[in-house]
Amino acid sequence: MTQENIPVQPGTLDGERGLPTVNENGSGRTRKVLLFLFVVGFIVVLLLLLVFHMRGNAENNHHSDKTMVQTSTVPMRTFKLPPPPPPAPPEPPAPPPAPAMPIAEPAAAALSLPPLPDDTPAKDDVLDKSASALMVVTKSSGDTNAQTTNARIQALLDSQKNTKQDAGSLGTLLHGTQTDARMASLLRNRDFLLAKGSIINCALQTRLDSTVPGMAACVVTRNMYSDNGKVLLIERGSTISGEYDANVKQGMARIYVLWTRVKTPNGVVIDLDSPGADPLGGAGLPGYIDSHFWKRFGGALMLSTIETFGRYATQKVGGGGSNQINLNTGGGESTSNLASTALKDTINIPPTLYKNQGEEIGIYIARDLDFSSVYDVKPK
């Protein structure tokens, strides 16, 4: 297009540049956009086709693998008929039956016993003429057979018992200790019952000296009520008598006292027969212990001292001006023998326990005490 063909727009000057036209550029840009969209759509379609194709191949491969696994695990089976068995050989002719022989009863009893648990093979039965009815069986032979039968039965039982014991230690651990059952019962008339296990507080009236056996007494310091706590059975001030023995030995610090009877201020008496205890319930009564040390070792120590000084004086007089002293030489054998004899006579002196009057002790009730024969309850 030349300049001559361009129409002159009104309001413009000659030589002035006019407005550019955009019609041609706009149409070219639209073509580019359409071409780009077409290319993008084509690529998307190709990608979708590729994805569907890959998924179909994966499903086909999975189906083929599953089919192969299933077909490979099925074993091949063949059905064949077993070969026919060979014909049985002809049976030999049966021998004629032997005449029946009567058998004595002891022999039949012996044959009915089970075999002993050993590895001895069973022997064939041999016809014994002594078992026939024509033979005479005496009483002694019958007793012998009975003893043999009992011996075989006992041996069989012992073998079975040993087999159970040899089963191992686990078998013994699976069996617990069998204990006898105990039945519960109710205490009768608890209003007049002082139950076993109660403790009576008591103060000594007499001094205890274990040198010789003796008697003892104490006074109850607290009221004792019935098992249900409703009835006063033993009043405070009741007297309890007992006895003790001279049985204290070396190393012992308690004495055993047996309290035998209780007497209330109202004249009610009952046999107690229960042991003494300390205020906390410990068995036995504690006290002061005299071990008699000087009585046991004083004579021997005195004789040993006399012997030592005698040897020293003898050596001092006979040794002149020597400054050395030997206490293991010289005479004094008779003095040494006297010391051994004295120690032998006094070493076994037993200790003595002393417990003064007025000290608090306890008495453990060892049995149920029933006062229903002397007491009664009346409604108010």
UniProtKB/Swiss-Prot annotation:
Transmembrane segments annotated in the record for this chain:
33-53
Region feature (Disordered):
1-26, 78-102
Q: Give UniProt keywords alphabetically.
A: Cell membrane, Membrane, Transmembrane, Transmembrane helix, Virulence
Stored Gene3D superfamilies: Type IV secretion system, VirB10/TraB/TrbI
Question: What CDD domains does the annotation carry?
Answer: VirB10
Biased composition range(s): Pro residues: 81-100
> What's an example GO cellular component term for this entry?
plasma membrane
One Pfam family recorded for the sequence: TrbI
- Tell me which stretches of the chain form a coiled coil: none
Query: Record's superkingdom?
Result: Bacteria
Q: Where in the cell is it found?
A: Cell membrane
Principal location listed in the UniProt entry: membrane
Its membrane topology, per UniProt? Single-pass membrane protein
Q: What are the disulfide bonds?
A: none
Q: Record's family? A: Belongs to the TrbI/VirB10 family.
Task: Provide the protein name.
Answer: Type IV secretion system protein virB10
